Swiss-Prot record:
Transmembrane segments: none annotated. Residues 1-27 form a transit peptide. This is Amino-acid acetyltransferase, mitochondrial. InterPro entries: AceGlu_kinase-like_sf, GlcNAc_Synth_fun, Vertebrate-like_GNAT_dom. Its EC number is 2.3.1.1. Pathway: Amino-acid biosynthesis; L-arginine biosynthesis; N(2)-acetyl-L-ornithine from L-glutamate: step 1/4. Its main location: mitochondrion. The gene is arg2. GO terms for biological process: L-arginine biosynthetic process; ornithine biosynthetic process. It is found in: Mitochondrion. Residues 542-713 form the N-acetyltransferase domain.
Length: 724
């Protein structure tokens, strides 16, 4: 098969409506030729020509058959990877809104011809995004769902909107020379699949620790060639290596991109750009090695439009318009760090890794946590803990105990897990975690809040890209392939598992997920009273004097948050009368995008007048009175996880209870995050709690929980009773 025909086939597989008719068109050619040869038996010359060309035709057919088989297998692996990463309808709609389908102009259907149809090489069309309308075409169930496909005409003419933003993922591949060929191929395959889904990739190849600059440049070039070859070997993959794209004035400073278009041209052609960490001096044109983190920062600044040169005398409005145009041209959606050390480990509290990091709230705390862990390596530790902690730092804890943190534990809690004496390798690993954390903090600050980052291992990405039969041994049994972390993240903009999900809910089937950390610039978190100063308790003076009329609280926005989340009007005065005087605290995420109101409730068996007696204070029930998230923030951005984690890990780690209607669709989310649940007979309420030892070790506490959940009266303006 000619190179041109190969390119045609590779291109046509991206348009499923074309691929669906490909076998019929291709095999119609041999049948037509056979009929013509039979008709030509009357002419000896034609018969002789047929005898010479028939073996060539059979050889050509066999070659094309093998090519189609390879393409079919590649498509099968791609669709399987996509389906195993499939998400909810809400998340699919969000993905389609971020990656809109290419505009289509429908043509009237034409009847299929019975005569021979030659396979003519069409003009190759470069798509700036992904056309999910045709992508989901062959699946019948999805075909009937308007979310994934609009219209039913199979033959369409595509018009490309070149003004659509180019979605880009900046990828850092760390210590590439330590990775085997199989891992490199798996990473290349995943990057190719991301390209098919509309996410162009620009990869910075870090060769790893090298002694001198000359060896560094040589190793960087070798590893870039290695990755490029692996990408080109993938079905439909195209790599473009760039060696001379960076310049800098002097050593030590962050380089700059020579030309913006040098990056954009191959990206718009669906090529995966591979950048070597080498910069040239503007004065001497001498090449020098550059830290890969500095390259990532330089690329981020360039693609974000921050390196645009403007005339100081230019009208500020013109400058703003030009800057806005640059930002609309490119959308840096993902920052991906593929590092053998994996996600960021946690050394405080019971969690073993940070699965989701709200940078606005947690960056300083996690950075300090890692620095303190490095400092503690110099102290004495029980050697029995060495193997456990080595796994925690080196592989970011690939064990079944999986939990992340949104809000770090308070100083009053236990500080650090013991660390091993042998800290050479450990120290290096933790330093790598600190550098990765700082890199994503610096780059996410330059990007819109919608951008996100993810840290994971190349091995995990490679394994999830491989077919399941290649992963399982003969003695193993599996029903489905592992979820491709990067594809799942592209579709959902979330970690593979909710960060507020307790480790007990995950079982032993998700060890690889703890090797990843999902990061967003996020939002600030306001907690009243501040548990870092005064822990929440019934006898806390801060809690006793806190009311919703506090000047630190924007009551009108809080009421709007509650009414928008519950889709009901609140009787504000009645609600204030009920909760003021018994508030435990308030948690607000961002600009009132989410929040929780918690109270200390008195069990009905205790008279209200005796509520504050010292002997009754331990029996006051920590109660989640309102948990609300704006509709526009529900299911996105991790707002609910941030608030919930603050509640159960920072404010009330000893436990909290709440109730929910039996028909509330959020109950599954509650159920997964609670230690227990109980249906309240004779009502439409279900009770949840996170308190350890209830009811096995504390039956009185359980009875108090149930009594409080039964006795709370709603404060809605419609005055509906509890049975609503």
């Amino acid at each position: 098969m000619s190179l041109q025909s190969s390119r045609v086939l590779l291109h046509r597989k991206h348009d499923w409506s074309t691929c669906r008719n490909l076998p019929a068109r291709w095999w119609s050619h041999p049948r037509s030729y056979h009929q013509e040869s039979q008709h030509a038996d009357r002419k000896p010359a034609s018969a002789s020509a047929s005898a010479w060309t028939e073996p060539l035709s059979k050889s050509h057919s066999r070659s094309s058959g093998r090519q189609r088989a390879r393409e079919k297998m590649a498509d099968k692996e791609f669709f399987l990877s996509l389906l195993t990463s499939a998400t909810t309808k809400r998340e699919a709609k969000a993905y389609l809104s971020r990656f809109p389908s290419v505009k289509k102009t429908k043509l009237p259907m034409t009847p299929k011809k019975e005569a021979a149809v030659e396979l003519q090489p069409p003009k190759e069309i470069e798509k700036p995004g992904v056309n999910l309308g045709s992508f989901y075409g062959p699946t019948r169930s999805v075909l009937q769902t308007p979310v994934f496909r609009q219209g039913s005409t199979p033959e369409i003419e595509t018009a490309i909107n070149l003004d659509e933003a180019l979605h880009v993922a900046l990828v850092k591949l760390t210590d590439a020379q330590s990775l085997d060929d199989e891992t490199i191929h798996g990473v290349a395959l995943t990057l190719s699949q991301l390209t098919r889904l509309g996410m162009a990739s620009c990869v910075v190849v870090d060769p790893g620790p090298v002694k001198d600059a000359t060896t560094w440049r040589k190793a960087a070039a070798e590893q870039a060639d290695r990755l490029s070859a692996a990408i080109d070997a993938c079905d439909g993959g195209k790599a473009r290596r760039l060696d001379s794209v960076l310049v800098r004035n002097k050593d030590g400073e962050v380089p700059k991109v020579i030309s913006r278009q040098v990056l954009l041209r191959p990206l718009r052609k669906n090529h995966i750009v591979v950048v070597t960490p080498v910069a040239y001096s503007e004065q001497t044109c001498k090449a020098s090695s550059v830290a890969s983190n500095d390259v990532m920062i330089a690329l981020t600044r360039e693609l974000a439009g921050l390196e645009r040169k403007h005339d100081p005398d230019e009208d500020p409005r013109v400058t703003a318009e030009n800057f806005a145009a640059l930002q609309k041209e490119i959308s840096v959606d993902r920052l991906i760090v593929l590092d053998p050390v994996g996600g960021i480990p946690a050394f405080k509290g019971p969690q073993r890794a940070h699965v989701f990091v709200n940078m606005e709230q947690e960056f300083r705390g996690i950075e300090t946590e890692l620095q303190e862990a490095m400092a503690s390596l110099e102290g004495y530790v029980d050697p029995g803990t060495e193997s456990d902690l080595s796994a925690a730092a080196m592989k970011s804890n690939p064990i079944s105990k999986f939990v992340a943190t949104e809000v770090t534990r308070m100083p009053t809690r236990p500080q650090h897990k013991p660390l091993p004496v042998n800290g050479g390798v450990m120290n290096s690993a933790i330093k790598e975690h600190v550098e990765n954390l700082r890199l994503l903090q610096q780059t996410l600050t330059l990007l819109p809040p919608s951008s996100s980052g993810i840290i994971t291992t190349p091995t995990d990405v490679a394994n999830s890209a491989r077919p399941q039969q290649d992963i399982l041994s003969v003695s193993q049994v599996g029903t489905r392939s592992s979820k491709n972390l990067l594809i799942h993240n592209l579709l959902t903009d979330k970690p593979a598992y909710s960060s507020s999900l307790p480790s007990e809910r995950l079982g032993r089937t998700t060890p690889s997920i703890v090797q990843s950390t999902f990061l967003k610039r996020g939002m600030p978190l306001t907690i009243l009273p501040d548990p870092r100063i005064t822990p929440w308790s019934p006898n806390s003076p801060d809690s006793r004097h806190l009311t919703l009329d506090d000047p630190r609280i924007d009551l009108s926005r809080l009421v709007h948050l509650i009414e928008d989340s519950f889709n009901r009007k609140l009787d504000v005065q009645d609600y204030l009368n009920r909760v003021n005087g018994r508030l435990a605290g308030l948690i607000i995420a961002g600009e009132y995008e989410g929040g929780a109101i918690l109270t200390w409730e008195t069990p009905p068996s205790i008279p209200e007048s005796e509520r504050n007696n010292p002997e009754n204070l331990p029996r006051l029930v920590p109660y989640l009175d309102k948990f609300a998230v704006l509709k526009r923030s529900q299911g996105a951005g991790g707002v609910a996880d941030i608030v919930f984690n603050a509640m159960v890990r920072t404010c009330l780690p000893q436990g909290v209870c709440w109730r929910s209607r039996m028909d509330n669709p959020v109950n599954k989310w509650y159920f997964e995050r609670s230690r227990g649940t109980w249906k309240l007979d004779g009502s439409n309420w279900a009770m949840f709690w996170t308190t350890p030892g209830v009811p096995e070790e504390d039956s009185l506490r359980f009875k108090d929980y149930e009594a409080v959940c039964r006795s709370i009266q709603p404060s809605w303006a419609d005055k509906k009773a509890v049975d609503d």
